[in-house]
Design a protein with these regions (language model features):
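Membrane-proximal, proline-rich intrinsically disordered regions
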Residues: 22-69, 234, 623-655
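Short coil/turn linking the two alpha-helices of tandem helical-hairpin repeats
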Residues: 152-160, 226-229, 432-435
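Elongated scaffold/linker segments in the mid-to-C-terminal portions of large proteins
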Residues: 86, 246-455, 468, 472, ...
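Surface-exposed intrinsically disordered loops and tails
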Residues: 179-185, 248-284, 353, 457-571, ...
Length: 655
């Protein structure tokens, strides 16, 4: 019997997935179910992609909640938060069946619907040499890879299949069969989508906004990061950043301009020491539009007309004091520890550092949170640290840095990836390259944070430098003045130069020749002022020692590295990774990346403290970094987080 494709694909697994056991993650009604795909047409294929996008709506909110509730950037309001959210926050996975957010079935719904589509779509159809189903084909492959990526990050080992599953017996066999570890999942996904990384050669569907689908380059870069293949990771993130114009060619818009210049940052003017400071907040504008988005899931603004996101009701409801999830003391403290640098006199190079007067530090957290006062309460109770990123509203910062927020409507879209992520992932990859012998790569990573992506980054793996005598075009030695103490006046000596004699590999990332990058600013400057000239934000021994709590005041009351401390290369490497992890928190807080980031960095640094201390310190108002001996943690949670097995959400057990 001929079936309508919207019904067939969008609801292929509906009526199943009751999730009483492992195989219920992927089940069909019975082995007698039959599906007729012989009459597929191009228009049906378009409708089936829309059906797949509909299923992506079902996981968008939970993707954010699972990553943030287990991380260090939120706390839960125990009087308002539903039990399911509190359990995730406490890493309590004992009642898997009752907690909808822990249920992986909807990810597998997406995956199986993608499998059905990919098995049936005809990519040979063409008109005038244009294969007009390739856009849908690549888009669906990218969605499937994205869904598997989330499962692998959350569960570590998962069932993996690429065949359409239409029978209960097959579903049971797959779900109860061997699980693939994360790296093997990524190997298979990379092989599946690598061919389609160029959005010019393989553009997303012409009928769709390309932001509906995850960019293939971002997916590849992410998976290579997890694998520790930093060369390929850097390649694809660089390609995403510099090739952004082709991704959004339909709008003739260069996304780089949305985040590379001064458009979306927080600036201060005047002297705080004289009480004349003023604040200009353009940063929060990012969250009232999707200009910088790379992947957006669209929702209805009103539940009467379709599916709505629940994030607004969780993070910033209209009810005074009703927020279930709040910004954690940990992220507020991290922001406060930053040094906001204000240029007060450019000619004389005079700068003022914010925390000296108000201890506000980086202002991005201030710019995306607000407070409520219950005017009906005799005590005028104040509720602070309410997260505004998921509420379409107007938020401004007054000169005293109090946020004024006016909520307007339900969130109608949820960004699952935005452009700034590509920059910070690129910086992460550069640091990994430095650890693999690519000299000065971490210096360029610091530039991404501090100065912006400018110039040409040329890095050599295991370079060997030698000294040679300089000769002219005739082969004669070039002479230069001999300035040694015992040299006679006017004496000359042969000139020597250091040159690169050999290297194992060379990489080059060119931003200088590309439009839009000459005015690129460091990501840290979006919330911490003029980071390019900020002496407290640098890759130098004093800043590293300050980060780990190993400085003292000398006899002239100047901060110096403690004499018993020697800053090593490993210290520099750890410091740079910590800075990127901090910047991911400051820039991308509450957007659904955090716990995965913590896991990946802890694995890369071979140090479970990277995750354990940050998570266990989320409720503490620390004024030092987690590297400092005075950093406070909740001991029971800290002990639990030291065990990597507690990082992953268990899959349901077969009954």
């Amino acid at each position: 019997m001929k079936k309508n494709l919207i019904y067939t694909v969008a609801f292929l697994l509906c009526g199943t997935l009751l999730f009483g056991s492992c195989q219920d993650m992927l089940s069909v009604d019975s082995d007698r179910v039959e599906y007729d795909f012989e009459s597929w047409s191009p228009s049906d294929s378009v409708y089936s992609v829309l059906g797949i996008l509909k299923t992506v709506q079902g996981v968008a909110d939970r993707n954010i909640l699972l990553n943030e509730l287990r991380g260090d950037l939120v706390t839960v309001n125990t009087t308002k938060a539903i039990e399911e959210l509190q359990d995730i926050y406490k890493f309590d996975f004992s009642d898997m069946e009752a907690n909808k957010y822990l249920d992986p079935k909807e990810y597998y719904t997406i995956i199986n619907n993608c499998n059905v589509f990919l098995a049936r779509v005809d990519t040979t159809l063409n008109k005038n040499g244009i294969y007009y189903m390739m856009g849908e084909y690549v888009a669906v492959k990218s969605i499937r890879a994205w869904a598997y990526l989330q499962l692998a990050v959350n569960h570590n080992e998962i069932p993996f299949f690429t065949i359409p599953v239409t029978k209960h017996s097959i579903a049971e066999e797959l779900m109860n069969g061997p699980k693939l570890p994360r790296e093997e999942v990524f190997d298979k996904l990379i092989a599946d989508i690598k061919l389609y990384e160029n959005p010019v050669t393989y553009p997303m569907p012409s009928w769709a906004n390309s932001k509906m689908f995850p960019p293939v380059r971002m997916l590849l870069g992410e998976m290579y990061l997890w694998k520790g293949d930093y060369k390929n990771a850097a390649k694809y993130f660089y390609g995403q950043i510099t090739g952004a114009m082709s991704v959004h060619a339909s709008t003739n818009q260069f996304p780089g301009k949305n985040y590379s210049d001064n458009s979306n940052r927080i600036t201060r003017s005047g002297k705080a020491s004289q009480g004349t400071t003023s604040v200009n907040n353009n940063y929060s504008d990012l969250f009232s539009s999707t200009n910088a988005s790379l992947m957006t899931v669209s929702f209805s603004s009103n539940e009467k007309y379709g599916t709505t996101s629940e994030l607004r009701e969780i993070f910033s409801p209209n009810e005074i004091g009703g927020a279930q999830v709040l910004a954690s003391p940990g992220i507020v403290s991290l922001a406060g520890m930053q040094m906001f640098c204000t240029e007060v006199d450019k000619d004389n190079k005079e700068y003022e550092y914010g925390d000296k007067y108000d201890y506000q530090g980086d202002l991005r957290i201030k710019a995306t949170t607000y407070s409520q006062i219950d005017t009906n309460d005799e005590l005028q109770t104040k509720y602070s640290n309410i997260i505004a990123k998921f509420n379409m509203g107007s938020l401004s910062l007054a000169g005293n840095l109090e946020a004024n927020f006016s909520p307007t409507s339900y969130t109608s879209s949820v960004m699952l990836q935005r452009a700034e992520l590509a920059y910070l992932r690129f910086a992460e990859a550069l640091i990994g390259l430095d650890a693999q012998g690519y000299k000065d790569a971490m210096t360029y990573a610091m530039s991404i944070l501090k100065k912006g992506a400018k110039g040409v980054y040329t890095i050599y793996q295991n370079p060997v430098y030698e000294v040679r005598e300089v000769v002219d075009e005739n082969g004669d030695p070039v002479m230069e003045p001999d300035e040694s103490e015992d040299a006679e006046e006017g004496a000359l000596k042969p000139k020597y130069e250091t040159y690169l004699a050999s290297y194992q590999d060379m990489l080059e990332f060119d931003f200088a020749s590309l439009k839009g990058f000459s005015d690129n600013i460091g990501i840290h400057s979006r919330g911490s002022g003029e980071s390019e000239v900020n002496k407290y934000y640098a890759l130098d021994p004093l800043c590293i020692a300050r980060y780990i709590g190993c400085t003292i005041r000398d006899s002239e009351d100047i901060e110096v590295v403690a004499p018993e401390v020697t800053i090593t290369y490993q210290d520099s490497l750890n410091y740079m990774r910590d800075l990127v992890l901090d910047e991911l928190a400051l820039e991308l807080s509450w957007e659904g990346y955090r716990f995965g980031d913590l896991v990946r960095f802890a694995k890369a640094m071979n140090d479970n403290d990277v995750l354990a201390k940050r998570v266990a310190g989320r409720e503490k108002e620390n004024r030092v970094t987690y590297r400092d001996a005075d950093f406070e943690v909740e001991e029971e949670l800290y002990t639990k987080m030291l065990d990597e097995s507690n990082w992953y959400i268990p899959l349901p057990v077969a009954k």
